[in-house]
Amino acid sequence: MEAIKNFFKWLLAFIVFLLLCVGFVLLYSYPQLRDRGFFDYLRHQQNPESVELPTAEELTRCADTPFIMPTAGWVGVLYGDSILGTSNHSGLDIFGLEGNGVTPVYAAYDGYVTRLPEWVSAIIIRHPEDPLQPSRQIWTYYTHMGDQAGYSHIIDQIPPGTVELPVKQGALLGYQGDYNGQSWRPIDTHLHFSIVLDDGNGSFLNETDIANTIDPSPYLGMRLNASCADRPPMCRPDPFCPPLASR
């Protein structure tokens, strides 16, 4: 009996400790989340008329930059962002506000689509010549185009197993969803978009590692790097981060 009492004492102490840790993380993160507009986004989700949320328009381009915006929505998580202690974010998260499977996703640039057989919600496009550095090949990655039950929102013309299907800039690829694989962590409907480096052998590197990806700022003509980003993003003639000394 004494052992059971001790067990519950330790369990209660652990729960209190865990709650304190969560509270500390939330308190530490609050200014970052506020400044990034997350609370406005949450308010908008509850009542769209309560706040005017700045959004990007699909298929638009900043001046003469090579890429178009691949989807519409609130550009909420930027390149290099860190949220609640997670690792640096390797791309952009663009949250559509119309519901699951509704907001279209388009090819940001001409290329060749591949969808691995096991990919439910993702495709990747090979671009033989980087429009900003033509000597190298790059890839653009699009994911979360499916629902939590595993139903894909990718168009039927790009079935699992598709390899090197030619696509033009602005071609429809699918629709935003909230599929997150086997992760315990639920997500809101959005598109994760990133630019991925080639491995030197004609394939793509692991997109989840930010070191294998490219800052999308100059490709879209906006400051999208978390270290100097405009929030909300806007077209700029100077999308690169200024030197640290001048910030």
Model regions and ranges:
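N-terminal Sec-pathway targeting helices
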Residues: 1-20
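Acidic, glycine-rich catalytic/binding loops that coordinate metals and/or anionic ligands
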Residues: 137-138, 157-171, 186-247
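A generic structural signal for short coil/turn motifs at secondary-structure boundaries
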Residues: 101, 149-153, 182-184, 203
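Surface-exposed, glycine-biased beta-strand/turn segments
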Residues: 25-122, 126-130, 169, 178, ...
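Generic domain-boundary/flexible-linker signal
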Residues: 122-124, 134, 181-184, 204
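Small beta-barrel nucleic-acid-binding modules, principally OB-folds
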Residues: 84-98, 129-134, 138-145, 155-157, ...
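Zn2+-dependent peptidoglycan hydrolase active-site motif and core
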Residues: 107-160, 189-192
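Active-site loop architecture of trypsin-fold serine endopeptidases
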Residues: 176-190
